């Protein structure tokens, strides 16, 4: 569907958006650093897998269950089968939590086998934005992203942070641990993570985190290479 990208930008497309589309179309499993992996290009957002002592810490499980399940299958095929020990929602936009039930179940959480971690105020804003305003937002998105257009030199290209919104089933599981203070630290499956709350930034409820043992800083969508 995107073979037309194998050329320089035509006169019908903004060159920056054309290049952004070429880069977003590079998809698959990527090693970020030792023990941290991402599946990119499977949905509007990327999903991150952090290896703990016994299993995975999954960060932002995409928008739809089908995409999240496919991403997890790719990880297992290439990196082995390990249980999910925790899910972290970086912020309250649906493309960062909607696929959660494609990776874990409510039973996993209720049994205490899996933690679900989110910033303070996450559930309130996830509900207010995605339920109360969801229909209106969806209609506006069709104009913003050109979702009714075919992908072509004269049609739809990428949407800045990804190739587009997936059209599968969205889901939700409530957090079991809410981060309420910047500097708060938690050790999850042997990995110490320090959190920084960033409310009212790219989303009403959002947070960054730091993994000192990996020298890795996660900034969610507070830092993107687009005008998103």
What are these regions (language model features)?
Residues 22-82, 206-211, 215-222:
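Conserved beta-strand hairpin/beta-sheet module of binuclear metal-dependent hydrolase folds
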Residues 93-95, 122, 223:
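Catalytic metal-binding/acid-base residues of hydrolase active sites
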Residues 31, 55-56, 63-66, 117, 123-199, ...:
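Metallo-beta-lactamase
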Residues 77-81, 103-106, 125-140, 226:
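Structured segments of extracytoplasmic/periplasmic soluble domains
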Residues 1-26:
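N-terminal pre-domain segments of enzymes
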Residues 54-55, 65-117:
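Active-site metal-binding motif and surrounding structural segment of the metallo-beta-lactamase
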Residues 36, 114, 193:
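Short, conserved active-site loop motifs that form the nucleotide-linked donor/cofactor pocket
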């Amino acid at each position: 569907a995107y073979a037309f990208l194998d050329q320089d930008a035509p006169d019908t497309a903004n060159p920056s958006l054309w290049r952004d589309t070429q880069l977003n179309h590079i998809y698959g499993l990527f090693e970020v650093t030792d023990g941290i992996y991402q599946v990119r290009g499977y949905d509007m957002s990327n999903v991150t897998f952090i290896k703990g002592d016994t299993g995975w810490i999954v960060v932002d499980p995409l928008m739809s269950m089908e995409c999240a399940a496919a991403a997890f299958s790719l990880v297992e095929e290439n990196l082995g089968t390990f249980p999910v020990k925790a899910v972290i929602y970086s912020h309250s936009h649906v493309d960062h939590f909607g696929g959660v039930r494609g990776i874990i179940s409510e039973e996993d959480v209720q049994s205490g086998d899996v933690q679900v971690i989110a910033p303070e105020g996450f559930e309130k804003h996830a509900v207010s934005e995605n339920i109360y305003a969801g229909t209106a937002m969806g209609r506006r998105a069709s104009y913003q992203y050109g979702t009714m257009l075919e992908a072509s030199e004269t049609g739809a290209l990428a949407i800045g942070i990804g190739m587009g919104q997936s059209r599968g089933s969205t889901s939700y599981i409530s957090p079991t641990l809410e981060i309420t203070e910047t500097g708060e630290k938690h050790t999850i499956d042997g990995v110490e993570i320090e959190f920084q709350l960033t409310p009212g930034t790219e989303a009403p409820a959002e947070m960054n985190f730091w993994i000192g043992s990996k020298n890795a800083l996660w900034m969610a969508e507070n830092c993107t290479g687009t005008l998103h």
